[in-house]
Amino acid sequence: MSNQAPFAAASGTFLIGGDLPVYRMGLGTMRLVGDYAWGECDDPAEAKRVLWRAVELGITLFDTADAYGPEIAEQMIGETLAPYAPGVVIATKGGITRPGPGQTEYVGRAGYLKQCVALSLRRLKLERIDLYQLHRIDARTPLEESLGALKELQDQGKIRHIGLSEVTPAEIEQARKIVNITTVQNRYSLADRRHEETLNYCQQHGIGFLPWYPIAAGKLLKPDQPGAPTLAQIAARHGATVAQLSLAWLLQRSPVILPIPGTSKVAHLEENVAASTLHLTPQEWAEVEAVVSL
């Protein structure tokens, strides 16, 4: 891999909803706020530099949520990047309240979601949100009510595309009877593949899959764990880190995967984007799969 940070274009392009192009390597913004998604981060100035550098590196997909901060990540994006560069796509989420650090409650009432969208538009300095994702399904509220509210806002031109987060194939099927679902955001990584069935469903139906926590290789990043030396050796062949290897694996795993690794440091951002140029050979892919199955 080159020492010069490449552009995100090397990761390839995906059309959200068939008409909204993004480079597949995106940026998640939860790390731009404090621990447990609460309050400001330790270095807000560096966090803003991350956003600027992301644009310079060609990243077009920025994923955020009103629950990050709460509100802080959206506000930082609006203050730092608006007016937005051509091609920049802002994806945000609503449907979670955060009473305190590490605390979450799911709220899917129609009136609440409409308010969430209105406030997100204001903070992000947008007239229309490119991709609005229901952050979690609220078991106390009929899905028809939650998604019906988002469909109404879509018809009004306030939302372009609608997505879901942390869902099963059955829930996606139910949702698609109400509104067109263009993306799904579930936890997924090289070492955490519990949502394999959901990813396969998304690939079958051309739905974008945004894996959150995509570098969470867990034990695979620890040198003293089984399989870790093998991953380190494969990464070293490419002049890369195991974290970069895990991102490259995601890009090769499925053409619908849109990794959104987060960071609060410019140097780490550049490392993540550089993973777009790493390509595993069939033999290396088999080696990685053998390690993951340990």
Predicted regions and their residues:
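Beta/alpha (TIM)-barrel catalytic core signal, keyed to glycine-rich beta->alpha loops juxtaposed to Asp/Glu
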Residues: 3-13, 137-294
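N-terminal small/glycine-rich loop or linker at the start of catalytic domains
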Residues: 18-38, 91-104, 128, 133, ...
